[in-house]
């Protein structure tokens, strides 16, 4: 029941083509491909900018001293 044979998928494909038509399916495929490409480009750009930030942060040092400011309040 959970697995479908190739004939089930071919019947579903024929029904989808009849309902939507090949032109509309082609446009959906192009839009989906463009979205995937845009996502990959965005991921690549964010990785590159992340490396730039790491290089900028890695060269700077900050000298600081921590102090304890815990106060006990008695009521």
Curated annotation (Swiss-Prot):
One Gene Ontology term from the biological process aspect of the record: protein transport by the Tat complex
Keyword Isomerase: no
Main subcellular localisation: membrane
A Pfam family recorded for this sequence: TatA_B_E
Swiss-Prot/TrEMBL keywords: Cell inner membrane, Cell membrane, Membrane, Protein transport, Translocation, Transmembrane, Transmembrane helix, Transport
Membrane topology annotation: Single-pass membrane protein
Biased composition (Basic and acidic residues): 43-54, 66-75
Function: Part of the twin-arginine translocation (Tat) system that transports large folded proteins containing a characteristic twin-arginine motif in their signal peptide across membranes. TatA could form the protein-conducting channel of the Tat system.
Family (UniProt): Belongs to the TatA/E family.
NCBIfam families, sorted: PRK02958.1, tatAE
Full protein name: Sec-independent protein translocase protein TatA
